[in-house]
């Protein structure tokens, strides 16, 4: 299936849907996904969830939150109506469920809006909601308008009215009516008639309660000035009935419906301010906080506030952002959100003057290329994809940049205390005070107890608890009195630091394990015969305020000494689980009458490579619990339920994990999820409420804070909040109190290049990222250039245009455009390898475009820490060189104009030795890769074509090509599966089975997709690069699953995994981007 690794942050629509925990909650949407975002944290936009849409979005509308009744236990925050290009309407619902801390996005309903799929004339061009009636409307470019009822409990297709306009619809809105005619519905449409003249039609219904009211409407139509055809936005005036604003390139106009009814063309209008040359208004939106007020943005980032009335329109500048803004603005006081148009999502605080920057989500679009520096031979391990940083190029001209993206979550350190080396955090102890709790640390020689205050104060209370040189098995805070369980005794310490003993054992016995859950459970070991016994103790408070231990009559002799213990309740019945070194565990069950019974459960089929060392549990309900048992590389899960007869039932299964080190489990503070870690691995175990199965998720922290972790715990629930998880952990001799911001998401940073970065290469020898750029401006003349990024130190080398070689000569000519860039690896007979940097360009001069093939050597001067380039060979050609790659041991394949050719290098003379080897092709090849002597290409007329190089005859021959003529973008061949993937301008991702020799028959040369119906499905975004093989190793079945990586023009990076059977119905997988 397709999985998006890094989502695009190019949002084309946005809504302020609610307030969540005192902060604005937004829904941001792209063509392919929806994200819920909170603005609570200063300097960061907290992204809760991503939801991938079934098809590409065409239009959206925000419905009222009471549009659908909330289900039991679920609180509906917002409902979004989305029309997609597959002809369907989807109702997306943002709901808050008791099981999850964050709002969840889901599809609530759907129906077919138009059977004309993937057609620009289908309905769904825009969606308008009626403010005073239960109606919504949608339209098409072809002039169709359909009105639907919206007061039904589900999105059934119930049409109120249908209209048809002879022309092209540009903009439509519902206009709020006067209070005296609140049942009246007014609909305004700006369109171009059959003669391309702009007109405005007004449709008015006196009432819209039943189907019979649909035909009882009146309509008015007026011609408007031709400049109205350039209107970018139309917005209703919510506080001025029967009025709306029209935004033009140089003017803003206030129109009234009664004026249109009278045919009056003298609209109230005013000229827009001149905001610099070649800067035009981008977006306009109503200010919901201030009546008769809206915001206006310009391309250069200027922000204006417009106040309007039926008499005047006033425009005032309120701020300059200093950066290019998107074409969408969303006011949500005190913030304003800017997004869209391949721009970053920017948030500014307008409650202060001048307005201040709040936070951003970096948009890596348009994305041209991406690389993983950790790849080996163009292959990635699936388990390493999320753990590594990806580098991508994006932007055009001055906005060009290098973007680094990493998947994970962020953390904020609230407190840190440097301690003695060698501790393990063994637990968190609650306190009766509201602002403090205790951390329990275990050293090989003693136990240490620290009191932690939320204001940052750390206090060592070990000495007051009489723990000097004593190692505790368990520590309990019972009614502000500490109960300390050691190997030889149990004693209590009062708040006044008075100590008294509760229980002691004889010299040939010792306590080895303890647990507490209403009762104290202790495993006592006999040192003489190595037998053990489970004791059950109850705490009682005496009249003088002291405590005593009451030993319950039930004590159990155990078969051997267990290694870990835990206790929990099921419907007020206590259960104690003890895990033994042999593959079995024992469960002591206490019913309501305190009668106890013992169950011995064998772990058949499971072998502990190492001793089971930690145990915890997750609660599913009052009658079901998941018990987690940790051993080396294995997490055993025991599902414990109560039967109808009230006795426990057990089911056992395992989850292998990816670390060889032991894991420490905590007793979960909320009993629904637990966090655990060891060394550099951090995990969260929870319960998936839909599948009712435990989920094991590795948490990646982008700040690399969690290294050498030995013990991690949640702080008590009373200090937690819904947006984050506050944890305590011990790492590198330091105790940290940190706030972990979940869920995980992509974190991006941007380095500006002031050019268009089109190609990326990773040089393993110098550990450098090579960035091939176009549109480099040197002395007011555009050319190309090279930039370099140091992967070792994570910094960009100083960029100096124009790019020079080691002799100080410019590498690129004026008006030279970089098209392709590749490494050429040449191997000689002694298996020595030489590496060259090959660049294909196009040079425009005197109205003609020629091409150059540049072959360079690249080295790193370690003294000056600079990259040195030397021009070795330059080949001039009649046409631009669109693609270049290596073939064979010392061959170079290139595509120039409508030809593909191969040149072979003589290693002795360092010159090309073969005669001309070129083959005409139908159209220019835009992408090319090789495997052995085969060349896989994408061209402007063929999504894929395969050629073979015959070294004996020095000739290229066509092997096969696509059956249909499609404008190809890129292709990628997975040799292990003999599968060739292609992407094209129709947004198709197609897979072909490629195996065979050169065919003489034209029909035999045609490639057939494996599954035509599936491969012809459109993807949500344009895939423009296919890159990297992906290997997933199934450790259970010892199977290897292959896949590939790809990216889309709007900034998504995705992976595709294929089943082992290439002829199965799941072989063709397309990106749901």
Curated annotation (Swiss-Prot):
Q: Source organism's superkingdom?
A: Eukaryota
How far does the signal peptide extend, from start to end residue? 1-36
Sugar attachment sites: 132, 544, 632, 703, 732, 953
Q: Name one Pfam family in it.
A: CPSF_A
What InterPro entries does the database record attribute to this sequence?
Cleavage/polyA-sp_fac_asu_C, RSE1/DDB1/CFT1/CPSF1, WD40/YVTN_repeat-like_dom_sf
Q: Which GO terms describe its molecular function?
A: ATP binding; nucleic acid binding
What GO biological process terms does the UniProt entry carry, in alphabetical order? nonfunctional rRNA decay; recombinational repair; replication fork processing
Print the keywords alphabetically.
Answer: ATP-binding, Glycoprotein, Nucleotide-binding, Signal
GO cellular component term, pick one: mRNA cleavage and polyadenylation specificity factor complex
Where ATP binds, per the record, is at 392-399
Classification via PANTHER family: DNA REPAIR/RNA PROCESSING CPSF FAMILY
- Protein name in the entry: Uncharacterized protein C3H8.05c
